[in-house]
Amino acid sequence: MGESFDAFSLDEDMPMETNEKRKDGRDRGTRAQSAVVVQPVAASRHK
């Protein structure tokens, strides 16, 4: 039972849906960071 429980918990820990959501989250986080970086640069250019 220990082995099948390990395999089951692994499936629950890293399902394909979670992996896709994690990738989306990383992409959104990167976009948010670049947007935050671009805004101050654009503001200083306007000044």
Curated annotation (Swiss-Prot):
Q: Where is the composition biased (Low complexity)?
A: 32-47
Stated name of the protein: Tegument protein UL11
Question: Which gene carries the instructions for this protein?
Answer: UL11
State the organism of origin.
Psittacid herpesvirus 1 (isolate Amazon parrot/-/97-0001/1997)
Keywords from UniProt, A to Z, are: Host cell membrane, Host Golgi apparatus, Host membrane, Lipoprotein, Membrane, Myristate, Virion, Virion tegument
Q: How does it sit in the membrane?
A: Lipid-anchor
Location(s), subcellular: Virion tegument; Virion membrane; Host cell membrane; Host Golgi apparatus membrane
Task: Spell out the family assignment given in the record's similarity comment.
Answer: Belongs to the herpesviridae HHV-1 UL11 family.
Q: Does the keyword Repeat apply?
A: no
Which coarse location class describes where this protein primarily resides?
virion
Q: Where is this region: Disordered?
A: 1-47
Q: Does the keyword Protein biosynthesis apply?
A: no
Record function comment: Plays an important role in the cytoplasmic envelopment of tegument proteins and capsids during the assembly and egress processes. Also participates in viral entry at the fusion step probably by regulating the core fusion machinery.
Instruction: Give any extra note attached to this record.
Output: The PsHV-1 UL11 is much shorter than the other family members.
What domain of life does the native source organism fall in? Viruses
Lipidated sites in chain (N-myristoyl glycine): 2
What are the Basic and acidic residues biased-composition ranges?
Answer: 18-30
What GO terms fall under cellular component here?
A: host cell Golgi membrane; host cell plasma membrane; membrane; viral tegument; virion membrane
